């Protein structure tokens, strides 16, 4: 426990809140090659690798992921949600924050239905999260 004299000399410091998605917090100005600390909810990037990964201990699956180089120069791992995808090596994608609990190092999700990523086919429920269009009513 600190004494009052010690606290007067050097007060307690606030804990710094660390971001869970740091790649979304930086913008790169290519004209003067400087980064600015401005948060953006989504970032555009180009896939450099697309593959599958096995999850942590109690779970078992082949989860789809992509390594994406963002417009600010960061290279991150992103999860591809939904069944089936059309992403290849040079596909342009949109990323949002949000980790996948059982995949180590994956802190971002790819937004389905934007840019080069198509929505999930034949999706009926929670369509907006997977970029699926409203199905035509049967007449």
UniProtKB/Swiss-Prot annotation:
SUPFAM superfamilies in alphabetical order:
Nucleic acid-binding proteins
Q: Which GO terms describe its cellular component?
A: ribosome; small ribosomal subunit
GO molecular function term, any single one: structural constituent of ribosome
Listed A to Z, the keywords are:
Ribonucleoprotein, Ribosomal protein, RNA-binding, rRNA-binding, tRNA-binding
One GO BP annotation is: translation
Q: Name one Pfam family in it.
A: Ribosom_S12_S23
Q: Where is this region: Disordered?
A: 119-139
Instruction: State the NCBIfam families in the record.
Output: rpsL_bact
What family classification does the UniProt entry report for this protein? Belongs to the universal ribosomal protein uS12 family.
Do you know which PANTHER family this protein is assigned to?
30S RIBOSOMAL PROTEIN S12 FAMILY MEMBER (PTHR11652)
What this protein is reported to do is described as:
With S4 and S5 plays an important role in translational accuracy. Interacts with and stabilizes bases of the 16S rRNA that are involved in tRNA selection in the A site and with the mRNA backbone. Located at the interface of the 30S and 50S subunits, it traverses the body of the 30S subunit contacting proteins on the other side and probably holding the rRNA structure together. The combined cluster of proteins S8, S12 and S17 appears to hold together the shoulder and platform of the 30S subunit.
Q: How does it assemble?
A: Part of the 30S ribosomal subunit. Contacts proteins S8 and S17. May interact with IF1 in the 30S initiation complex.
Q: Which HAMAP family match?
A: Ribosomal_uS12_B
| Name by which UniProt lists this protein | Small ribosomal subunit protein uS12
> Source species, please?
Mycoplasma genitalium (strain ATCC 33530 / DSM 19775 / NCTC 10195 / G37) (Mycoplasmoides genitalium)
């Amino acid at each position: 426990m600190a004494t009052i004299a010690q606290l007067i000399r050097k007060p307690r410091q606030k804990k710094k809140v660390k971001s869970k998605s740091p790649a979304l917090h930086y913008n790169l100005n290519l004209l003067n090659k400087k980064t600015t600390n401005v948060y953006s909810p989504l970032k555009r990037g180009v896939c450099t690798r697309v593959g599958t990964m096995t999850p942590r201990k109690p779970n078992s699956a082949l989860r789809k992921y992509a390594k994406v180089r963002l417009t600010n120069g960061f290279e991150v791992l992103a999860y591809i949600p939904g069944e089936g995808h059309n992403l290849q090596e040079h596909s342009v994608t949109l990323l949002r924050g949000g980790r996948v609990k059982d995949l180590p190092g994956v802190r971002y999700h790819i937004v389905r239905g934007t840019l080069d990523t198509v929505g999930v086919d034949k999706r009926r429920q929670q369509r907006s999260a997977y970029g699926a269009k409203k199905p035509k009513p049967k007449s």
